[in-house]
């Protein structure tokens, strides 16, 4: 039933977002001189929820927000400020920035560990996540289903019990 599948999917997505249980290292990225914007390429049917860490040539980069970046380094896009990256910015679920803008092209220079979540259109998730967190997924799904109003199975008290143990 698509209603049940949809609620299982929503529970798994929420579990991954809130707990960080679904993580992976992405393939190394080659940086290109003068380019600061890079694609996040997670496994199929997943999205990057959060960047856990970024290494540039083995050195850890500091996460920074776009607002703080513009305050600290307002001219960071100008060629005279290019250099060795010190910061990363998660711009969207598909893009991140390196700052300063790299001043050299270096193969496989950048490594990332990310927190993943399934897409809302996905039909599967990592077996490890589904197996290791089966009980939480079942409890979260039952909470979601039982709290639906005006259904023959609606049970707000039961939903509250499953919410507490989820």
Regions found by a protein language model. Give the residues of each.
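Glycine-enriched, solvent-exposed interface loops adjoining structured elements
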Residues: 1-166
């Amino acid at each position: 039933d698509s209603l049940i599948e949809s609620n299982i999917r929503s529970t798994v997505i929420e579990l991954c977002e809130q707990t960080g249980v679904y993580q992976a290292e992405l393939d190394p990225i080659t940086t290109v001189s003068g380019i600061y914007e890079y694609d996040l390429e997670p496994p199929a049917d997943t999205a990057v929820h959060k960047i856990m860490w970024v290494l540039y040539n083995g050195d850890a980069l500091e996460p920074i927000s776009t607002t703080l970046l513009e305050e600290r380094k307002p001219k960071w896009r100008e060629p005279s400020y290019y250099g060795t990256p010190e910061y990363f910015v998660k711009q969207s679920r598909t893009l991140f920035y390196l700052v300063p803008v790299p001043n050299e092209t270096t193969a496989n220079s950048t490594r990332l560990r990310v927190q993943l979540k399934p897409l809302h259109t996905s039909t599967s998730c990592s077996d490890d996540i589904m197996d290791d967190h089966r009980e939480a997924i079942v409890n979260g799904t039952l909470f979601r289903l039982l709290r639906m109003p005006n259904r023959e199975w609606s049970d707000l008290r039961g939903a509250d019990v499953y919410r507490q143990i989820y």
